[in-house]
From Swiss-Prot:
The lineage of its organism: Eukaryota, Metazoa, Ecdysozoa, Arthropoda, Hexapoda. This is Extended FMRFamide-7. It is found in: Secreted. FMRFamides and FMRFamide-like peptides are neuropeptides. Belongs to the FARP (FMRF amide related peptide) family. Its main location: secreted. Keywords: Amidation, Neuropeptide, Secreted. GO terms for biological process: neuropeptide signaling pathway. The keyword Kinase does not apply. The keyword Transferase does not apply. GO terms for cellular component: extracellular region.
Length: 9
């Protein structure tokens, strides 16, 4: 998912 990409921080 796109949000998951930055949520990983």
């Amino acid at each position: 998912a796109r949000s998951d990409n930055f949520v990983r921080l």
